[in-house]
């Protein structure tokens, strides 16, 4: 089975919207609202995917999966409920939240757009690896254009002179940008977009765990409770 012109079109548009444009908007919103509120707003991801998958792919969830989705989203909201030290004014906060929702909606649309291509190559690991890499190419065009336009004015390469940021920057780029997207694409190819998106929401819970391991951030009773609720929700989605 080979990629058609329509498949290439879907991959290119998906990369530009979901990686090139959405990531920039999301990172800008993250600078405004902070990680805690961003994690809370991120709960709109699976509802957006479910909505787009219903409209464009005709997907449906079972009642048990809806219950599991509610558990996962509820767990994230529960973990983020007592937010402190909000880093901006109310007006900027609202602006940042709107940007974050827009970015997440674009990510959701982009993955639903490419879902038919992934389903064609279900289980074909080499082909899915190639698709993950190819999708990054158009996704890199937008940041490259922005770099060429604004580098002289803002000296965007100046922070790279600090070699302390090289390891986390390169490591994050490899693990999050390519390997993360690669495994995400494999999962998306093996099940429905709606189910995969719900399970993908557990990333927020993993952030709590890894923040404890690597950043020594406190793991509160609220966080532990949220993790247990999210695990139960993921199990319901899986068996549903």
Language model feature labels by segment:
Residues 9, 13, 17, 44, ...:
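Hydrophobic residues within alpha-helical transmembrane segments
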């Amino acid at each position: 089975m080979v990629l058609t012109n329509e498949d290439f079109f879907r991959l290119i548009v998906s990369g530009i919207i979901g990686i090139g444009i959405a990531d920039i908007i999301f990172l800008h919103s993250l600078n405004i609202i902070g990680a805690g509120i961003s994690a809370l707003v991120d709960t709109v991801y699976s509802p957006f995917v479910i909505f787009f998958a219903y409209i464009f792919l005709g997907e449906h969830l079972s009642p048990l999966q809806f219950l599991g989705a509610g558990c996962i989203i509820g767990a994230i909201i529960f973990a983020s409920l007592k937010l402190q030290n909000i880093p901006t004014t109310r007006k900027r906060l609202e602006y940042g939240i709107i940007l974050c929702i827009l970015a997440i909606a674009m990510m959701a649309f982009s993955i639903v757009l490419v879902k038919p291509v992934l389903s064609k190559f279900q289980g074909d690991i080499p082909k899915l690896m190639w698709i993950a890499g190819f999708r990054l190419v158009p996704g890199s065009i937008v940041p490259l254009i922005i770099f060429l336009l604004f580098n002289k004015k803002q000296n965007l390469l100046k922070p790279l002179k600090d070699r302390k940021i090289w390891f986390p920057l390169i490591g994050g780029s490899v693990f999050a940008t390519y390997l993360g997207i690669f495994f995400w694409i494999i999962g998306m190819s093996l099940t429905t977009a709606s189910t995969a998106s719900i399970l993908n929401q557990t990333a927020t819970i993993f952030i709590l765990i890894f923040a404890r391991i690597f950043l020594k951030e406190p793991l509160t009773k609220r966080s532990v409770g949220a993790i247990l609720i999210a695990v139960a929700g993921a199990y319901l989605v899986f068996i549903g």
